[in-house]
UniProtKB/Swiss-Prot annotation:
GO biological process, one term: proteolysis
Residue ranges of domain MPN in the record: 102-225
Protein name as it appears in the record: UPF0758 protein azo1137
UniProt source species: Azoarcus sp. (strain BH72)
Binding site for Zn(2+): H173, H175, D186
SUPFAM superfamilies: JAB1/MPN domain, RuvA domain 2-like
UniProt similarity note: Belongs to the UPF0758 family.
Lineage: Bacteria, Pseudomonadati, Pseudomonadota, Betaproteobacteria, Rhodocyclales
Ranges spanned by the short sequence motif JAMM motif, renumbered to the chain: 173-186
Record key words, sorted: Hydrolase, Metal-binding, Metalloprotease, Protease, Zinc
UniProt-listed InterPro entries: MPN (IPR037518), RadC_JAB (IPR025657), RuvA_2-like (IPR010994), UPF0758 (IPR001405), UPF0758_CS (IPR020891), UPF0758_N (IPR046778)
Length: 225
């Protein structure tokens, strides 16, 4: 049965317009993105297939073009559309962060970090550069790979902060394995970088660990800064 034959209050588009996007399931939201199904399968059916195939929305959104296009009914055009939607979400959250004190919007910071780092298959170290009012100047992915005191160079972090005239920084890195807990190496690295930046009067306000799924962990909230 086609979606147009469903009761009106069960159709994803009509449900969104009458009750808001929060009322829709993951599959219904994804079906609106897909717009149409294929022979014998509605857009909702295809959406459920995608979620079942990848397990989570995070894995779906971080799929490669070849993985995405391998699903019946999908293709490179849909993959490009999905990446565009994700980038729009990242940019919208970046505008929010740039317009206000980051400490007034901690959940926006977490949401943005999940979008920027949570889907990456490799460990990435990101530096958020803040001005004296704690508004975002820029965010830079500085290092990739296994992060240790020997792979993250303090001089590069200090140089970046000075070049951007930052008054403070927030660090973030992802754990592709899914673990949200800071490791002892993470704590040692943070102390090492904090000491280096203190020499040039730049504050380290926080360090977030971003898991593949779930809520990023704040060092500051744990008393580790």
């Amino acid at each position: 049965m086609a979606i147009t034959d469903w009761p009106e209050d069960e159709r994803p588009r009509e449900k969104l317009l009458s009750r808001g996007a929060n009322a829709l399931s993951d599959a219904e939201l994804l079906a609106l993105f897909l717009r149409v199904g294929i022979r014998g399968r509605t857009a909702v059916d295809l959406a459920r297939d995608l979620i079942a195939r990848f397990g989570t929305l995070t894995r779906l959104c971080s799929a490669t073009s070849s993985e995405f296009a391998a699903i019946p009914g999908m293709g490179l055009a849909k993959y490009a559309q999905l990446q565009a939607v994700m980038e729009l979400a990242r940019r919208a959250l970046s505008e929010t962060l740039c317009a206000r004190d980051l400490f007034d919007s901690p959940e926006a910071v977490r949401d943005w970090l999940r979008l920027r780092l949570g889907h990456l298959p490799h460990e990435t170290f990101c530096v958020l550069l803040l001005d004296a009012r704690n508004t975002l100047i820029d965010a830079v992915d500085l290092f990739r790979g296994t992060l240790t005191q020997t792979s993250v160079y303090p001089r590069e972090v200090v140089k970046l902060a000075l070049d951007r005239n930052a008054a403070a920084v927030i660090f973030a890195h992802n754990h592709p394995s899914g673990a949200a807990e800071p490791s002892s190496a993470d704590e040692q690295l943070t102390r090492h970088l904090k000491d280096a930046l203190a020499l040039v009067d730049i504050r380290v306000l926080d360090h977030f660990v971003v898991p593949a799924h779930g809520k990023p962990t704040s060092f500051a909230e744990r008393g580790l800064i």
